[in-house]
Structure formats: C-alpha cells, structure tokens
Amino acid sequence: MGSHQERPLIGLLFSETGVTADIERSQRYGALLAVEQLNREGGVGGRPIETLSQDPGGDPDRYRLCAEDFIRNRGVRFLVGCYMSHTRKAVMPVVERADALLCYPTPYEGFEYSPNIVYGGPAPNQNSAPLAAYLIRHYGERVVFIGSDYIYPRESNHVMRHLYRQHGGTVLEEIYIPLYPSDDDVQRAVERIYQARADVVFSTVVGTGTAELYRAIARRYGDGRRPPIASLTTSEAEVAKMESDVAEGQVVVAPYFSSIDTAASRAFVQACHGFFPENATITAWAEAAYWQTLLLGRAAQAAGSWRVEDVQRHLYDICIDAPQGPVRVERQNNHSRLSSRIAEIDARGVFQVRWQSPEPIRPDPYVVVHNLDDWSASMGGGALP
C-alpha cells in the first residue's frame, strides 16, 4: 500500500449548512464513528483510514465541485455522502469518469443504477410499499401528497400513487413547496390539505421545512381530529425540532430507529452518545452512513488493498451485522438488502415500532414487481402490514 492512490482515505460529502444540514450532520458523524471503529481494529493494511470533509451547503453544483476536488486534487477514490437526490445525480458523472466509488446512505426514488454508486438507503419496495399498505389498512384510503419540489418527492409520489390505486385508494391532492419554503408557501399548502379532508397526509418534505409543515398542520386543525402525517424521511433529527404534541401520532417508515431494543442497536446508540456532538442526532440515515462506511472498510481489509477494483470484489461477499440487523449489497444492482420498520411517534417523541419485516427485504429498485401482493411474497415470507 505504498502508492498515493492506495492511501486509506475517504471523502465525506455531507452539508454542515443548508436546508438538510441537521440530517447530513448525523450522517457525517455516523460515517466518522465507523472510521474510528475500523482504525481501532488496525485500519487497512496497518494504516489508519483518514477522512476529508467539505461543506457543499446543500447545493448540487457544490457537491460536484467538492467531489471533483477530492478526486483530482486530494487522491480520494472513495466517497460517502449526499442526501438529496439531485446532489447524488450531480456527483454521479464525477465518480463514473474517475472510476471512484460513492456510498450513498439515503432513501431514494429508485430507477437508477451506477457501477460507481453503492445505494445504502431503501428503494421503493423497501419503504413505500409497506407504508402504503399500513396507511390504507390503519387510517383509510383518502390521501394527500405533499413534498419538497425536487426529484425525490416527485418520483416517490409517482410510486405511491400507483400503490394507492392498487388498493382502491384515492389521491386527493398532490402539493409541492420549495426546498426553502416561505411562511406563505407553507400556509397555502396546509389550507389545501385541510380542505381536502384526507384520512392521511403523505409527506416527502425534507429538511427545515419538515418541522414548519408539521407545526402548521397542527395549528390549522387545532383541537380537532387531524390526519396523521406519514413520511419516508422524517427522522429523530426533524422531530427534535418539534413540540411533543406536534410530533405525536405521526408515522415513519425506515430500516432503523434509535429506539429499537436489540443488543446491536443499544451498542450503536451508546457509541453514538459517546462520539456525536450535541448538535448531531442518531437517525436511520446516520446508521446507514455508519454501516456503509464499515462495509467499505471491511471490504478493504479483506482485500488488503485500498484500490477500488479490489475493494469492490469483496464488497458483495460481506454481511454486516448493522444496528438495524444484517445488511448486504446485491451484486447485480448495487442496492442493499435492508430491514423495513414502521413506527408511530409517541408523546415523548420516541419512535414506537408497530411493524417490521421478518427479515431483510431484497431491493427492487426498478419496481419490477408492480403488485403489492407480489411484493408481500418477496418480503421474507411476511405479509404486508
């Protein structure tokens, strides 16, 4: 491992500022925790893994420029990072041209493959499908969609609309607000939600707008019965910004919640409490960044090399005992087998798991299986919730 190209170095592409800074900060520290653990084990080939960080500020162009700087000027071949889909898409051609590797620890809309990206967050069959079944069964068939105005919410809503129609559900409204919404943007959206009289609200709003939206909906409904807000992305980081009565009763689907009472989860939470700063929250996407970085290091240790081609050869053979449970990457599509859990938030802001898949779900990023009943058969033999 004497060459510059083989220096154990990871570039972290997580924003410290911007609309998704809270969640990306949690991801950054999840990745750093894994690096600390790997270095306690001796690093790679006896050399410690080093990290470089930049703050792209949530701007896709800056993600691209940061990735180019890491690769061209700093000798980085492995990146961990990106949250919003348009930031991943900005980085994709950079890593493909350089034959570098990006580990992407975030849920996304599916319908994508790159040999230079390892997808560590859920695809639609691992989150949207079980959530749609759960909402229809437990809350009703009438739904309003609201999302931030970029790729991921629009594509996720396309999939969710299809799933609702399969079950005889009705999408009453599909509303989008800017990534940096004004008070008026939020109020207009909430009034449309209120007038629709939906059974449930499906939100793909991300970042700072999440708490603003949830708070505005609670105000508009007052003491009346308000529909639950269900989300693929709302995490402990966003809930920490809400009052307890605003968060209570909301529904989230994710592979992991910090409230899971297993030995692996308890150990992870304890490690995070000893490592994370006060402004970083333990989230599902911190867990994804943690296990993806751990997998990267384990593959390099197995290869005895920090070369991309050597690491990739071992990447698919390793199963990580992650805090969520066992995870592994599928060779044919670079997506990950993940657990799926649906939780409702209680009065203390704790995510109480109401359903979980009996075993990790194989990814179906291209939605090859179109029917919810067929998806149920692919979920480790477990029925949809």
Swiss-Prot record:
Keyword Transferase in record: yes
Please tell me, according to the UniProt entry, what happens when changing T106N. In strain: PAC181; butyramide inducible phenotype
Q: What Pfam families does its record include?
A: Peripla_BP_5
Query: Domains: what does the record tell us?
Result: Consists of two beta-alpha-beta domains with a central cleft in which the amide binds.
Task: Name any Gene Ontology BP term.
Answer: regulation of amide catabolic process
Q: Which UniProt keywords apply?
A: Kinase, Repressor, Transferase
The molecule here is called: Aliphatic amidase expression-regulating protein
What task does this protein carry out? Answer: Negatively regulates the expression of the aliphatic amidase operon. AmiC functions by inhibiting the action of AmiR at the protein level. It exhibits protein kinase activity.
For whether the record's keyword set contains Disulfide bond, the answer is no
Give GO terms: molecular function aspect only: amide binding; kinase activity
Organism equals Pseudomonas aeruginosa (strain ATCC 15692 / DSM 22644 / CIP 104116 / JCM 14847 / LMG 12228 / 1C / PRS 101 / PAO1)
Could you describe the subunit structure of this protein? Homodimer. Forms a complex with AmiR.
